[in-house]
Each structure stands twice: as C-alpha cells, then as structure tokens.
Amino acid sequence: MENFHHRPFKGGFGVGRVPTSLYYSLSDFSLSAISIFPTHYDQPYLNEAPSWYKYSLESGLVCLYLYLIYRWITRSFTVKQTVGSEFSGLRKAHGILLWLLSILFLGMTAFMFVNDAFPTAFSDPPVKICLLAYSVHLFLLHSLRMIYPRARPTLYHAAVLLNLLLLPPIFHFYSYPFFFVDHPPLSSYSPFLWFYFFITIVGNFIPLFTPRVWYPLFPEDNYQPSAEQVCSMFNFACSYGYLNPLVLTAKRRVVEVDDTPVIPDYDKNKAWTYRFERMKTPSLFITIHKIFWRQILGMGVSSFMVSVCQFLSPIALNRLLKHLESPSSSSVNPLVWIVLLLTGPFLTSLFTQFYLFMSTRYLARSYTTLVQQIYNKVIRSRFVQNKSGDSKVGRSNNLISTDVDDIGEIREFIHIIVRAPVEIAGSIYLLQKLLGWSAYVGLALTVLTCSVPIVLGPLVAKLTLRANRATDSRIELMSELLQSIRITKFFGWELPMLDRVKQRRQVELNRTWKLLLMEICIQVLVESLPVFSMFATFVVFTTIMGQTITPSIAFTSISLFSFIRTQFSWIAYLMRQIVQIFVSIGRVSDFLNDPDEVDPVNTIEDTSQEIGFFNASLTWVSNPSPGDFCLRDLNIVFPRNKLSIVIGPTGSGKSSLISALLGELSLNKGSYNLPRSKGVSYVSQVPWLRNATIRDNILFDYPYIEERYKKVIQACGLLTDLQSFVASDLTEIGEKGVTLSGGQKQRIALARAVYSPTSIVLMDDVFSALDIHTSNWIYKHCFQSSLMENRTVILVTHNVHLFMDSAAFIVTVKNGSAFPVTDKSSPLLFLAEQAASASEAAAPDLAAIPIPNEVDDAEAADEKDGKLVEEEQRVTGDVVFSEIFSYMKHFGSGFYVAAVLLFFVTTQATSILIDLWVAFWTNSSVNSPDVNNNKFLFVYGTMLLAYSLLDFLRTVSYDRGAWWASRKLHDSMLESVFGTFASWFDKTPTGRIVNRFAKDIRSIDMNLSGWLFFSINCFLSVAGGILSVSSAMPIFMIPAVIVCLAGYYFGLLYTRAQVGVKRLISIYTSPIFSLLGESIVGVSVIRAFNRQTIFKQMFSERLDNLVRLQSTSYNLNRWVAVRTDGISGLVGAIAGLIALLQKDLSPGVVGFSLNQAVIFSSSVLLFVRSCNSLQAEMNSYERVLEYSKLPQEPAPTIAGQVPATWPKEGDIVFNHVSVSYSAAGPTILKDVNLHINPSEKVAVVGRTGSGKSTLGLTLLRFTHRISGEIYINGRETQSVNLNALRQRISFIPQDPILFSGTVRSNLDPFDELEDNFLNEALKTSGASSMIMAHTDDQKPIHITLDTHVASEGSNFSQGQKQVLALARAIVRRSKIIILDECTASVDDAMDQKIQKTLREAFGDATMLCIAHRLKTIVDYDKVMVLDKGVLVEYGPPAVLYHNNGHFRRMCDGSGITFLPPETRGSKSA
C-alpha cells in the first residue's frame, strides 16, 4: 500500500504534502494534520512514536517533583488545614477507589513489562521503564495520601496530575487508527489491553467527580462553605450540578433566599474591598484590571479556544459534503466528520460556558467592589450646602443602578481583542483556501464595514452621554420629589410636578431614540455588508475566475461569512458598549476621586487638647465664591465636662458652627479641634432617624444595657409615647420617622445621643419641636441628671432662659462671626432672655410613672406587631404569553403590532429562501457545468437586498413600538405613584420606589425589548429549521421533536428557578438604594457618632445578599446551557448521519439541511436562554405594572369643580366628625363638633398624640373619615375635587421642604406670578432681610429670588426654610391657612415678627395654628384643646382660662395669665 505520509491531501482546505514530523500542528489550521494519521495499526509512524511518549512522561515526572518540592517549601504539609463537609464520606470513598485502581494499574503495567506484552508504540525499553515508574509513583502517591493526612491535598493533586499525563498517549494509541476507512478490526486488540485502557480512563474521571476540600478564607467568621466550594470539579465547572436542589425546589414551590447556595467566602464583599483598597490607582480602568486580572486572563484564553473550536463545524461540513460529492476519493472515515459535527459544538459550548462563567464571576465581583466603593465615598463626602452636590442622591443612585452595570460589561472588551480577530482572520484564511483570491474582494468590503462603527463612534459617544445626562436629570428629580412627596400633596401640586417629570422623561426618550436610530443604522449596515461581501466574492469566483461553485464550497463559505457577519455585528454593538463603558468609568472615577471629603477624625487620646476654633475660617464648599456663607475668624474654646450654649438670630450660622466643629465644613485658614478618643454624639436640628424600630434608633448599634436604657427613656420623656405604640419601643417608625410627630422624632434623636457612651455631646436646637412641659422635663431629668455628668455638652438653643443658670459658657453667633459672652448680665443676654419663651413649665412628676412592660421586656413587645414598612411583594408563578402580549399592546394599535410581527416572519422566511436558492444553484452547477451563473447571482443579490430592507424595517418598527411602550409604562406608573394615598409612602421606602423608576424603567428601556426581539427571532429560527430540514429529511422530525421536548423540559425547570431568583434580586436591590439614600441624609450624624464602619458593614451585608442571588442567577444560565447544548449538539451530528445513510439526497440539499440543522441546534439553546432572560426582564414589567395599579385618591370630576374664587371666606364646620388613618385602623378623632368663623385665628393645643396634626390633615382629606361632615364655605369637602381643595388651603409644616432650584422656583414653581409680587412676599415674610453670606469686604448678601436653593434646601438653616415656607404661603393667598408649629426653629425675635406677619398678611384668612408655645397664641380668637382625639374645650383663650379646665392648667404651667373677660361665655363645640 502507498505510504500515507506522502499522499496528497485533496480537499477544500489543504494542498500539497505534509511532513511526518508535523504532529497536531496549529499552524495548519485546516486540519491537514489528518494526513499524518496512518491507515493501519502497524504503520511505521507508530514505531517512530516512543521517543515522543518517553519525553512526555519524563517531563511529567520532572514537573511532578518540582510541584512537590514547591509545596514542601511553602509549608503546605503543615499549615493547610481542611474543613469537612457533607461530602467528606464520598471524598474518602473516591480516594480508596483511586488507590485500588493505582494498585491494579501497577500490577498490569508490571505484568506487561515482564511478559513483553506492550503494544508496538510502547515497546521501546526507555518508554516501558518510564511507564512502570509512572505506575509506581501513582501507587506511592495514593498510598502516602492514605497514611499522611496533612499532605493529602498536595499528594492528591500530584496523583491527579500524574493520571492526567497518562491519558493522552494511551488514548491516542487506541483511537488513532479508526480515523480512516481501512481501519483495523476491533479484534486486533486483546481484552487485556482494552481493560488497561478502561482503568486509565476511569482513573482520570474519578477525580472529576470527587468532592473538593474547602479552605476557609476567613476562619474567624465561622462561615459554612458554599455548595460551589465543596462540590466536585465536574459539578462545579461542567454540569453545575450543585444547583440541582435549587432547580428541583423551584419546580415544587416559590424560591426563597435560603434555597440558593450561600455566597462563597472568596466572593464576599470584604475580600474584594480589601483588594481594591490595596491595589487602588488614580485610574479606575487600571485598578479594575489589576484586581481582576485572573478573571480577564481566563476570559481571554477561553474566548480564544471558543474561536478555534468554532471552525470545527464548517470544516466537518466541508469534508462531509466533499465526501458526498466524491465518495471514492475520500480516505478518511466519514464518521469522523459526523463526530466532529458533534464535538465541535460541544467543545465550543464547553469553552463558551467557561468564558461566561469567568465573565459573570467578574461581573458579580466588580459590582460588589464598585458599589461598596461608591458607598464608602458617600460616607466620606460632603453633601450639605454643596452646589455641585445638589444631585448627589440621584447621582449616587444612578451610578449604582446604571454605571456600575455598564462597567461590568467591560468583559465584552475581551471579545474585540481576542475573539473577533481570530474568527475574522481564520474565516478569511479558510475562505482563501476555498475561493482563492476572490475572497479578498469580500475582505476589502469587510474592512469598509469595520470602519463604519469606528468613524461613527464619537457621534455615538456624544449621543450616549447626552442620553445618560437626561436619565440622571430625571432620576434626580424623581428622588427629590419622592423625598418631599407629602409637601407636594399638601399643596395639591401632583399634576404640575407630574408634568415636570414627564418633560424630563420626554427629553430622555428623544435622546434615546436618536441614539437608537444611530445604532439601528450601524447595526443593519454592519450586518448587511458582510452578506454583500459574500455576494461580491461569489460574483468574482464564478464570473471572473470562471470556477464552479459546489455545495461544499458554497455552504462552507456561507458558514464562514456568517462568522464574519456575526463578529462585525458584535463589533458594532460593542463599539457602542465600549463608549458607554468608558463614559461610565469616567463618571464613577470622577465621583470616587472627588476631593470634597471631610477630614479624617482624630481618635488619639490627648486630655490636654482643647475643644474649639483657633483663628479659623470655614465654608461649606472647598472653593468658596463671594456669595457663599463663611464662618470667619473664630477663636472659641469650649470648656470640658461643662454645658456650653450657642445663641444667635435665625440664619446667623449657629448650626454651621456645630457642623464645623464636627468637620463637615471646609477649613480655609486656622485650625479647629474636637477630640474623638472617647466618642462624640450629635443631635441635628432636623432629627435624622433610621427606617427601623425606636429601640434600634436609640441604641444606634451600641450594646443594650437595660438599666441605662430605662433611664434614658425616662429622662427624654418617651414613656407616655411608648405606651401609645402597639409594640412599644419595637415599633417601626418608617422612613425619616414618618409615623412620629416632630417632638417625638426630636426626643428619640436626643435619646440616641444621651444613651451613647460618649464624652462629648453636640445638640442643635433640640427644643424647637417640644412643648413647654416636655422641654422643662428634659431639662430637669436629662440635662441635670447623672446621664450628663462629666460630659462636654455644646447646645444650640433659643431657650436662653432655660439654661442661663446651668450654662458654664455662652457663645453668641452673628453673621458668621462668633464670640464668647463672659458676663451673664450682658445686655445681649438680657435681650435674648426677654425675647425668649416666657417661663419654665411645671410638669407632673413623670418619674413616679413606672416604665411599662413593653420597655421592661423585649419579648413581650415581640408578640405585638410593630412592623410598619411592608415587605416588597413578589409576583409568583411563570410569566405567561398573555403578559408578553400585554406588553406588546403598548406598542400601538393591533394593526401596528401585526405589521411588526409580519416583518419578523418575512425576514426569517427570506433568510431561509436565500439558503434554499444557494442549494438549488449549487446542485445545478454540479449537474450542469454550463449553468448560467448570472441568473442565479441576480436572484441571489435581489434576495440579499430584500433581506437587508426587511431587516431594517423590522428593527425600526419594533424599536419604535418598544419606545412608545416605555413611554406609556413610565407615565402610567408615575401617575399612579403620585396619585396614591399618602399613607402608602409611609409603608414604602423611597429607595424602593426610586429603584422602580431607575433600574426597572431602564430594564424596560434597554433590556426587555431587546430580549423579546431576540426571543421572537430564535423562535422563528427553531420553527424554520425544523420545517426546512424535515422537508428534505422527514425522519429528522423525530430527533428535532426530542430535542425540542428536552429543551422545553430543561427550560421549564430553569425558567422557574431563574424567574424566582430574578424576582428576589429585584427585591434585594431596593434595600441597597434605601440604605444609600438614608445614609446620605444622615451622613453627618453617622460621622459624628463614628459609625461609618458599622454602616459600611451593613451595606456590605446587603451587597453580599444581592451578589449571592446574582451569582446564582448567572450560574443557572450555565446550568441550562450545558444541558441544552449537550442535547442540541446532537442535532447536527444526527442530520449528518441521516444524510450519510440517505443515499438519494443531493449534496446541495444536504448542505442546505445541515446548515439549517446547525442553525436549529444553536437556536434551541438561544431560545431557551432568551425566553428565560425575557421572563426575568418581564419581572421589571410586572413591577412597573404593580405600581401602575396602586389604590388611587379620588380622581377629579366635573361635579367636583369649584369656582376660582372658592372659598370666598374661610368658614369651616366640623359636624360629628370621626376619622382614622385607614379603614381598619383605630379612631383618632372622635365626634368632633366645631364651627370656625371666617377670618378667625384658632389655635389647636394638646399633648403629643392628642390628634392636633390629624385635625389639619382631616381638613385636607389625608385621613379616612368614619362619620360626619366637614363644610368649607358651605360646601362639603368630600364633594370638592381633591387637588382643588388642597390648592385652596395653605399648609405650613413643621419641617419645611424646599426644592432644588432658586427661591423664585420655590415660591412660584410654575411661573405664574410676576417678580414684583414674589419680592413683596419675601419682604412681608422677612426672608429678604435674612443674610445668606458676606462678600470679601463684609457686605451682607441677602436672600433674593435668584438665590440658589440646594436639594431639600440644605444650604439654608432650618429657620430660614421656615420663613421661606411662610413666604410660599403668602404667595398662594389662600383663605384658609394651617400652621403646624411653623416657627419652632426660629429665634423669638423672628417668631414675634412672623406672628405679626401672619396677622397682617392673612388678616382676612382663617388660620388654624397647631402650637406648642402658648405665648404665641394668647391673642388668637379661639383655642381648641384636644385630648386623646376628643375636643374637650373650644372658645376664646381668656374664657377657657377662667373655666379652670385643661387650658387653664397648661397656662399655669407656662406662667401665662388672662384678665377676666368683660363677658363670659364661649361658642362651645
């Protein structure tokens, strides 16, 4: 027989002779290495092989020795300790089995050595000795592992390595000859050798199924291993079998968090945060690559292998079609190509899954690292009064919800670097082998294609940046409006605010559509040009070169051109992604590198250090402008362990002084000092409370000491309040303490500062929201108690009289300057005291009241339901097609949706017809050499042009419909949220709502429509593949149905698990945003208490919970992929086998069928994956729909309209009114009867919880009316449209809210009034006389209409905000005014001025004032006294005083007296 080594290899990919020395050469990419395969077992090549085997075995032994020496030097035998798991028994059993196999292998090798029974390839003595040495080493390693426990892992790894080195030569020896038609019979191998081969294979596969040993990364955490860490390598890297329990659980019931595998310790947040801090560089891009280089390297290697394996299928297709065209000329067994059609997709899938596994691991790790760094930056940053930081709440939310996800997509950068060049270059090389120089024609057009996204890249970057800015703007506005939703509802501003959000949403959508159109044009162009490149190549090949196009050439070329088209499509997509990635990296990097941070605190103990300022000047911003407020030339030293008070007029800088001492201001010159070694506690002017229980807010993560806790509760006057709560101190208070009154919030914040074991306590006007009784109680039982002994207390207050005797040091602040008052007889103090509230209050001795059981015993309170915030609802069950059609209905009319679907069908049908036409053309070329190629080329080109046009129309019509759907869904949810009851916001954290408008809307905008598009395409590809192949090979329907059923089964299991996990991800994302927003608002308090580490840990734990679910979600994708890939990979092989056995099929039909079979097999997995991703993204659609169907406040009706002049006068009547906050809630106001005459000034007084605020809310219809009627100007309020009612009543809350913008936009947010009127309102309220800052020459800068307002008015003092709220009420010119202690935070001089303004500006208006300071309402027309929801007294204050009732006792406690009225009597209720 002819020597096969010098036999020409004839085919599409190899030309010439191949030397025998070339063995598996990667340089011959076209598998010409097959030419070295011998046709018989006894070919000379096998006799030349022993040296190759010998060197391999000897090299393996050397590597093994080096490995063992390295492990010994690194003390692996003595330091490492393994941790047991539930698989320990299985691990031991596998170890014993491997030991037995090593004995058997040694015995068989020794037997062959003695009896000279080695095969020819192993008969050389050196090789025999090496193999025997290997057997001895294997036996020794397994034996040592049985008796030497500390070294077991190292020895085990060495044995596995040794086993693995044996497999290639032995496997090659047995499989080598069967690659050829004339292979030797199986009987030529003895059973002994087959058994030898078998135990070699088993010895290598057992380690794959052996559970692994776990080494804890953080032994101190007492952390249990994740299933991912102890399962076998096969379950970990191949089958993902450790997720089987989760998948089976999801089949039976709804998935819970505890059903998912715990997060591995190497993926915990603290591990990656530590690495980031250690490897941090100024460039975030470089830092990311330094930290995650292993994942990036793994992605690069696996991506390269995917590219290489991709070519196995087209090579096999070419050779199989070549065999069918000329069976006699083929020497290679055609079953080899069938096997290659199976192994090609299998290997591609294996490396693809490994690539995806590494990339999703990078995704999860980069997410947890960057999000934690953003939060850490938030904790360090200055937010208050920073103009550049107005939007930091929304900006931080957007960085986490958008930019961090975009940075995670940097993994796709590997695609352009590795995979695209390899596949494009490989395809061009193989096309050149197939089509000669005509392939370079296509290459030229391909280069042109490549330039399109590069040229348009800057434009895409610009459009992307503009769209992102629009998204930021919308999210920032939404965050601000949701933070102040109650003031919006108080004023009836829902509809105008809706319009503002919708305008920003429209800008965002317009910019997004421009970007989308650009992407569509690039995508269609990039996908179409490779197709026309293929057309041009065929034209040159057939007409100019005069070659005949055969099925093996045509369909292989189509596959290769599809590779090029796919890669350039990816390039077009990734060019936009890369632009977005670098934009996001820049945004996150700018945020993290922002130098505006507070100074690190000094915790060094130094008792000699003084507390105060030393020639210090400070501002809120790092680079102040002339108009910015400044504390100037401060020289103040506060005495240690004494009480100091800070006084001054409203807006003078008192709160800034305290913030400066805490390090919240930027130091421009001088120095300041606040020792932190023994801790600092701080009570802000606006109390900051966490969304937690009362007890958690007071403890603030300090240990619970029962005795001290009881004393603090008693000292802060909280006993009565706790008795009124259902679960006492275990009652949840909601976001920002929304369920509490202003006084209750202030006292809880005070209790937190008093309970903490700190030596320094800073308090900012803690008495502003307290009534006289409570103020005096706290002064007596808190400030003068043992709780405050040996503590340095610095208190900002207007109650000078209360602390005059006990204060050791007094500081006066005026216009940013401060100086001490050394003489208590100073005229300044005299004036302050005269202006202060009248006198101390004699309160009942609450000390005699025992602390109730709820405070004594936490267990008793646990039995009661103190929960306020409802858990986020989860939609359960599978997402059905009705929901998908429900989403598509938002595209437009039914006709429009039908037209879009028709474009999908016709585009897919055209694609199939193109391949069918190629089959018809190539068959004609084979049967008739003189075929008219021009006719076929013309039809072929026309079809390609039609396909490109249909593709464009399909994409544009679909994306436009999705754009409309996004707009409608956003607006529907927006209107629903703004139209729901105010009580819903008490139960729903703002972060949860923001998450719906940020992450879920983004999902609908970007992901949902894309996955639906992809799912429809995949479905049509599957259906088209089945119909196409079955039409030529009907028997193919059987395996196709089996594959579809198997795909459906695995897809069903997978989808139920994945959708459940995705829904959990959505739920566990909201707490991250909630804690972020909560921390930004209270960051100064967190820093003052030095609780940054605790809050970082809380955030880290929430991140770990989220990453646990995200990793499970990613790995579930791998779970289904390996199963569906394994099944669908059989399809191509089965189709090839059918074609081989079915002799009557022409090569063209076979090529068409195999091409469609490959498309079908790949589309099955893609369809399962896309359906899952679609269902997961539909979760966002469900969540948006959920918030679009919230219970709504009554909608406006024609009957509810009122004249523009209504009410002409403020006549108010309550007729037997009883209300509650919900239909099932307790009655708050009980049978209230009263009549308020027009223009009367009525004060509402009573103890905390008596129902004062509820009365005002009832007038605005914020409560549930149980019975009775309320009339305003003779009209029942229930019959008036809600927005009209609230717009005609002005409400001035205790905690005023300002919106970002200017003073003008806050007074007149809808530009309806002239500046003259607005300036008059500023002047009347006194706001225009307030000083914001000073210029460099000390000239004051007053508040004007153009004064900048930061988010929530953070650049104004609390008193200034209350005055601006008064100005806003003046602008509204309402006939009814409700004031809820609106002067609590102003000094008494300003209070008196405001009271005068109220009487003058609202002389003809009816005023309802909820008051704590009795002196401010002594000249009111009437007073109503509420007690536990009952109106107990109502009448003129002098009359009530002399009735000796509730009001008299309150006046006596305040030192207020009234002269006897000339006429007694009152209009009783």
Curated annotation (Swiss-Prot):
Gene Ontology MF terms: ABC-type xenobiotic transporter activity; ATP binding; ATP hydrolysis activity; ATPase-coupled transmembrane transporter activity
Superkingdom of source: Eukaryota
Keyword ATP-binding: yes
Stretches assigned to the ABC transmembrane type-1 domain: 296-580, 897-1176
Reaction(s) catalysed by this chain's protein: ATP + H2O + xenobioticSide 1 = ADP + phosphate + xenobioticSide 2
A Gene Ontology BP annotation from the UniProt entry: phytochelatin 2 import into vacuole
Keywords, alphabetical: ATP-binding, Detoxification, Glycoprotein, Membrane, Nucleotide-binding, Repeat, Translocase, Transmembrane, Transmembrane helix, Transport, Vacuole
Gene3D superfamilies: ABC transporter type 1, transmembrane domain, P-loop containing nucleotide triphosphate hydrolases
Membrane topology (UniProt): Multi-pass membrane protein
UniProt EC number: 7.6.2.2
Keyword flag Nucleotide-binding: yes
InterPro entries assigned to the protein according to its UniProt record, in alphabetical order: AAA+_ATPase, ABC1_TM_dom, ABC1_TM_sf, ABC_transporter-like_ATP-bd, ABC_transporter-like_CS, ABC_transporter_C-like, P-loop_NTPase
Residue intervals of the ABC transporter domain: 611-840, 1214-1453
Protein name per UniProt: ATP-binding cassette transporter abc4
The species this protein was found in: Schizosaccharomyces pombe (strain 972 / ATCC 24843) (Fission yeast)
Classification lineage: Eukaryota, Fungi, Dikarya, Ascomycota, Taphrinomycotina
